[in-house]
Amino acid sequence: MFDEDARVASRELDLALTTRDRSVADPEQRTPMCGVPYHSSQTYIARLIAKGYKVAICEQIEDPATAKGLVKRDVIRIITPGTVTDAAMLEEGKSNYLGAVYCEAGKCAAAFCDISTGEFCVAAFEGDNLSHVLNELGRFAPRELIMNKGAAETQTIPDFAQKKLGCLLEMGGDDYEYTACAAIVCEQFKLNSVRSEEHTSELQSLIR
């Protein structure tokens, strides 16, 4: 790890910082670096995930014997607190939820999924809905929460999630168009449609 990644890892994992730039007179201008043994990397990754960090795994993507110059490396996997599936990084007997909240025009919907088990729950609210959303967040206690702009702008939801639950916050993309979202749901669950004559507004919030 290098630069700011190295500084963060050094602080959070009690690792010694070093540098290759010994020839640079000013220590502040040297590139900090640190690392861990490959065989024990999972232990260190688990500690970072437990502290709420995202971890990107990079590996060589070409044979060093045939590479010209520096061996190419690329990100092959990103692990986040809400997307962990490795049993060694999960607390035994405790759910590990990834949450999502969508708020728009007086309506809110929340979804929670434990990717390691496949458990999935959704709920939609109208009217005085913030208290209901906070109750659901407190009940499921997600490790990571994805929000749309409407949910983030309430301030109440991100503050509660971050300060009370200590979960990692992520902003969802701008594309919450209903038709596109419904198509994804139909493809995932092998449905012809998600139309309903009842609870139409709640359903649309949930789909988004």
Language-model segments: residues:
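Basic, polar low-complexity surface loops/patches
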Residues: 1-197, 201, 205
